[in-house]
Regions:
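Generic hydrophobic secondary-structure signal
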Residues: 1, 28-32, 45-47, 74-77, ...
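Short, compact, well-ordered microdomains
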Residues: 58-91
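Negatively charged, low-complexity tracts enriched in Asp/Glu with abundant Ser/Thr
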Residues: 1-27
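A short, structured beta-strand/loop element
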Residues: 26-61
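A short, structured loop/turn motif at beta-sheet edges
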Residues: 21, 35-38, 65-67
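Generic alpha-helix detector with strongest preference for long hydrophobic helices that associate
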Residues: 7, 11, 26, 51-55, ...
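Generic structural signal for short, solvent-exposed loop/turn connectors between secondary structure elements
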Residues: 1-8, 52-57, 89-91
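Broad hydrophobic/π-residue packing in well-ordered secondary structure
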Residues: 15, 39-41, 76, 91
């Protein structure tokens, strides 16, 4: 199991790419989870750095009807916006 394989929600996550800024590198994962009560799908973003201690995650920032809608919304974020997300998360 590699550094990016172990975090809560990994089994529901898709690897979306990698971010780099200076010496920092983050693997970016999008976790989706059905919400049966609402009949919708929630999504949040995980940023996994070079050690397990550098795992950061957003709250549930997406709420859409289908998983493909969450993926589409995620695709609207630029690399700069994703870096702003990870830098704003306490860690």
């Amino acid at each position: 199991m590699g550094m990016s394989d172990a975090f809560p929600g990994r089994e529901r996550s898709r690897h979306m790419g990698e971010l780099k800024r200076g010496p920092n590198r983050w693997d970016v994962y999008l976790e989706v989870q059905p919400d049966a009560e609402l009949g919708a799908v929630r999504g949040r973003i995980h940023f996994v750095g070079t050690t397990e201690a550098t795992h950061r995650a957003t709250g549930w920032v997406f709420l859409e009807w289908q998983e493909r809608d969450v993926l589409e919304r995620f695709g609207e974020f630029s690399a700069v916006e994703l870096l702003q997300f990870v830098e704003a998360i306490p860690g």
